[in-house]
């Protein structure tokens, strides 16, 4: 979208604008700079929301945005419809009017195996008379379908799929999704009016965080990212939509005109070229992962590759879409009443299955929340055996009318925990039993309480054995202090033996005793000892997350860590101070404040400090051996997860990027690499290394 020279100039402009003050800007100055300021903000939106490679801090971005708002407030006649300030409308939408799509949003025909794909290819070759077909193959995003219309370069209307002919006008809600440009230079391609198809998505990690938050707040959970996205784009208040972390990928131009003349198949000849054009115009597209395949054999190979690596992709995909790449053939191939004949979806192995609820048990979480867990007849879903599923809370059970003995539809999508989608009430025999909630804690026997406004019953005994165990498990978990060897089973065993009664006890473990416990040899004891020692030097945000403060996930933990020098500093923050930090509201601030004003918690922090656990941020940034170097990973690594590799690179001063470009210094190639390898091979400045070379580079075995 922006050349390297243009980006350099925009970064220079950024510095100029950051030094401006609204008081020094008169009418003439405002008129001369306002469009450049808007373009600078659009550029930083593109870097952040499309490339995920910001070049300024959040504080600097906010300063630029405030300057633009101040200028427009001072001179309101200078406001334009595509100004970045116009993304969040102030009005509430009570009714979404119905609007007709320029072209129908048809479904795709589905295929489930190689034979189906070969049959599709045969039909296409017969209808076109060609011996071999060029196909464009891309992931099938599992989100909420949308249609966008741009006229004279401005975003005019956005709609839901609806029944395919008519959808709901959700323009205001789509404007707050920053990966949807408010303006795009279609005119530079000779296009006056264009209709684009896309999908609104929620990244898997953001979806997980949303559901964790909703669970804590006693709100109904979303079954999967698709449901969350579909529900979010139909919220009445665009400000609430903006909080959901939505993204939009566009994947098809369905209509394009110049002076009333249709350009598809004439000027716009290939689907892959159209995706490249949308990518260059600043849209989020499957450009990086779209592959042009010469014949059906290449298509099948690419589909198999993606089925193997689907769980490593940050978004939910439920298959691949195969399209004839030559748009001029579309008219000859035509449509059925249901789907186009020039495209087909290859569906991955199902992530849903029906099974029976055998029993329900009640578990106690680290904050005392009582969670009902259904024990299932084991069933395979997406290659994994599922034998239990959380029922979350009493409201969830009542809402779905779940009973012991019921046949239920269970979904497991990627990293998302298994979820009961629905009860198959038609399968009931009359022998099903209602689920009765306990009155007392199943661990310590204390009476349970249900706080006002919450859906969750809680045990308020802070010394409840189950809570203590869960707090220790959470502290040692991968996303917190990452103490390998201190598994859930090990924590429970050590607690039962009296070796672990609190989090600080981890750093007081007597390894002479552990050596004599069945199942612990010298090697496993030494590994555990080393893992515990290494955990003392984790980044501060991991320690904050590991403390298990209610409502504080990884993102909030990072926010808190960046606001202080040392952990103890948080006890000096008032609730008002905490609410000034990004994404921390009243409820979260109150929990944080209460935690750091609890004597027992402060005593625990002091003990951790005395035991050698790092409770401060580094005093100064060390220039690591990878300082200034940009890395991209492709394929699966044997040594560690992609997230761990990223953490190592960043700890040594390097950066990990999502996409291949001239800015990349190293591409690290693991098993079954994707299309990034082919792209990197075309850029001579990128050094391509294997996993072994990468490990030598970072000095690790």
UniProtKB/Swiss-Prot annotation:
Q: GO MF terms on file?
A: DNA binding; DNA ligase (NAD+) activity; metal ion binding
- Catalytic residues (positions): 140
- Does the entry feature the keyword Ligase, yes or no? yes
Q: Does the keyword DNA repair apply?
A: yes
Residues annotated as domain BRCT: 621-701
Top EC category:
ligase
Q: For this entry, list what GO says about its biological process.
A: DNA repair; DNA replication
Output the NCBIfam families linked to this UniProt entry: dnlj, PRK07956.1
Function field: DNA ligase that catalyzes the formation of phosphodiester linkages between 5'-phosphoryl and 3'-hydroxyl groups in double-stranded DNA using NAD as a coenzyme and as the energy source for the reaction. It is essential for DNA replication and repair of damaged DNA.
Q: What PANTHER family is this protein classified in?
A: CHROMOSOME TRANSMISSION FIDELITY FACTOR 18, DNA LIGASE
Q: What is this protein called?
A: DNA ligase
Annotated organism of origin? Sulfurihydrogenibium azorense (strain DSM 15241 / OCM 825 / Az-Fu1)
Which gene holds the coding sequence for this protein? Answer: ligA
């Amino acid at each position: 979208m922006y050349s390297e020279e243009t980006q350099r100039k925009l970064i220079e402009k950024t510095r100029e604008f950051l030094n401006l003050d609204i008081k020094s800007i008169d009418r003439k100055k405002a008129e001369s700079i306002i469009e450049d300021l808007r373009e600078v903000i659009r550029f930083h939106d593109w870097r952040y929301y499309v490339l995920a490679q910001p070049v300024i801090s959040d504080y600097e971005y906010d300063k630029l945005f405030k300057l633009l708002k101040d200028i427009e407030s001072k001179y309101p006649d200078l406001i334009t419809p595509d100004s970045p300030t116009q993304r969040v409308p102030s009005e509430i939408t009570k009714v979404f009017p119905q609007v007709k799509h320029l072209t129908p949003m048809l479904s795709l025909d589905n295929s489930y195996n190689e034979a189906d794909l070969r049959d599709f290819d045969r039909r296409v070759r017969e209808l076109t008379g060609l011996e071999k077909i060029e196909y464009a193959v891309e992931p099938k995003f599992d989100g909420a379908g949308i249609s966008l219309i741009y006229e004279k370069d401005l975003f005019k209307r956005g709609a839901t799929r609806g029944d395919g002919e008519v959808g709901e006008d959700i323009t205001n809600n789509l404007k707050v999704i920053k990966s949807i440009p408010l303006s795009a230079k279609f005119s530079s391609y000779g296009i006056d009016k264009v209709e684009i198809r896309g999908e609104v998505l929620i990244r898997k990690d953001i979806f997980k965080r949303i559901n964790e938050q909703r669970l804590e707040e006693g709100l109904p959970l979303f079954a999967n990212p698709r449901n969350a996205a579909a529900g979010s784009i139909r919220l009445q208040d665009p400000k609430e939509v903006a909080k959901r972390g939505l993204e939009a990928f566009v994947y098809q131009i369905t209509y394009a005109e110049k002076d009333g003349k249709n350009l598809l198949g004439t000027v716009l000849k290939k689907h892959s070229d159209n995706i490249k054009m949308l990518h260059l115009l600043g849209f989020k597209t499957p450009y990086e992962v779209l592959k042009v395949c010469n014949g059906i054999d290449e298509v099948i190979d690419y589909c198999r590759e993606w089925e193997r690596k689907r769980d490593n992709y940050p978004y939910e995909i439920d298959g691949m879409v195969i399209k004839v790449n030559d748009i001029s053939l579309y008219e000859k191939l035509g449509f059925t009443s249901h789907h186009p004949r020039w495209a087909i979806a290859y569906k991955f192995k199902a992530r849903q299955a029906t099974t029976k609820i055998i029993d329900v048990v009640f578990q106690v979480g680290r904050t005392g929340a009582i969670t009902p867990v259904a024990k299932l007849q084991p069933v395979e879903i997406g290659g994994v055996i599922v034998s239990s599923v959380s029922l979350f809370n009493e409201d969830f059970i009542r809402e779905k009318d779940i009973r012991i003995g019921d046949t239920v539809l269970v979904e497991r999508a990627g990293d998302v925990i298994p979820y009961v989608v629905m009860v198959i009430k038609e399968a009931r025999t009359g022998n099903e039993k209602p689920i009765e909630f306990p009155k007392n804690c199943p661990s310590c026997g204390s009476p349970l309480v249900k706080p006002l406004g919450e859906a969750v019953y809680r045990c308020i005994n802070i010394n409840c054995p189950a809570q203590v165990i869960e707090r220790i498990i959470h502290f040692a978990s991968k996303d917190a202090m990452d103490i390998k060897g201190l598994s859930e089973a090990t924590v429970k065993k050590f607690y039962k033996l009296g070796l672990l009664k609190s989090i600080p006890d981890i750093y007081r473990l007597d390894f002479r005793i552990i050596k004599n416990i069945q199942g612990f040899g010298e090697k496993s004891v030494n590994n555990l000892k080393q893992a515990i020692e290494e955990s003392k030097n984790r980044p501060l945000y991991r320690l904050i997350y590991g403390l298990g403060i209610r409502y504080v996930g990884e993102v909030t933990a990072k926010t808190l860590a960046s606001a202080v020098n040392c952990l103890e500093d948080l006890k000096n923050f008032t609730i008002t101070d905490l609410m000034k930090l990004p994404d921390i509201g009243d409820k979260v601030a109150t929990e944080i404040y209460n935690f750091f004003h609890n004597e027992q918690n402060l005593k625990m922090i002091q003990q951790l400090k005395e035991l050698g656990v790092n409770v401060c941020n580094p005093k100064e940034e060390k220039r690591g051996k990878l300082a200034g170097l940009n890395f991209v990973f492709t394929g699966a690594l044997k040594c560690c997860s992609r997230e761990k590799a990223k953490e190592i690179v960043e700890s040594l001063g390097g950066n990990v990027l999502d996409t291949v470009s001239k800015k990349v210094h190293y591409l690290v190639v693991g098993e079954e690499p994707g299309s990034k390898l082919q792209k990197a091979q075309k850029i001579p400045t990128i050094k391509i290394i294997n996993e072994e070379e990468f490990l030598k580079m970072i000095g690790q075995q």
